Amino acid sequence: MVMACAQQGDILWLDKEEQYVLVLSREFFNHSGMSVVCPLRDNAKPDALHIEISSDEYSGTALLEHLRSLDLQARHYRKISSIMYEQIQDITDAVQGIFDYYPYSI
């Protein structure tokens, strides 16, 4: 069975890992078969890299320091829900902050 391509903001359940993840990468990248995701937890304390999310079916915290890329075509997963645009915007801004270049002098 061919599964639809995951979309940015999708909350997925990974069967083998038995965990929820949030898809952070955009569709043009996800069509490669790979997707950048972060794990979701029910009981993590919110901070700069732990951002709370909610949808009709799930609420928890995205752990942005644990980004990873997954081959979703090779995994069994279920789409649980999607988060709102404003939430994905806050999350991608925080992730970008991890990689921003700030020159400094020694």
Stretches found by the model and what they are:
Residues M1-I106:
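Conserved functional hotspots at enzyme active or ligand-binding sites that engage polyanionic ligands
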